[in-house]
Each structure stands twice: as structure tokens, then as C-alpha cells.
Amino acid sequence: KNAMHKIKEMGVTHLLVDMPTIDFSYDDGRLVNHHIFWDIDQGSHKVNEVISHNTITEMIFVPNKIKDGNYLLQIHIINFTGDAAPSRPIIYPLEII
């Protein structure tokens, strides 16, 4: 929970993780971290009036040959109505001159 607040403070809008979920495996479906990331009141499933452009991509695979660093992210999201949609993130390395 504290980590997700820090991620929000940093201004992260597109979160990509190599885990099955950003929430605890057994949280009784509360999805606390998802709610924090999307500014949804805990215990509620009502989305705020403002549309969030934040995304979470779980279960990504990044080969070991990809170095830590700064990248541009191009994310392809299928036009899909629902609470989850498949995506295809592509990263491009940035060189700081």
C-alpha cells in the first residue's frame, strides 16, 4: 500500500510489472493497490467522473538482456469495454545527450 502511494507521488501513469497482480494474492477481491492507482475509493467500484488514462500491465516478460534505464513506451491497447484488456507494450531506449 505504501509503495503504491509512492508510485502515485512519482507521477507514474503506466505501470508495467512482471507479477500476476499488483495486489496481494489473497485480499478478498478488494484490489487495494488498483484502487489507489486509479483514485477509486476503497471498498467502492464506482469510477470517478474523470476518465483515467493510467494503465497497469501485469505479467509482462522482459528478457534479461534488456538493461535498466530510461525508455519511451508505446503501448497498444485493444479498444475493448471491460475491466481488463490485452495490451502490447513496446519500449525504445533513450539516449541522454
Language model features with spans:
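Active-/binding-site microenvironments in catalytic and ligand-binding cores
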Residues: K1-I97
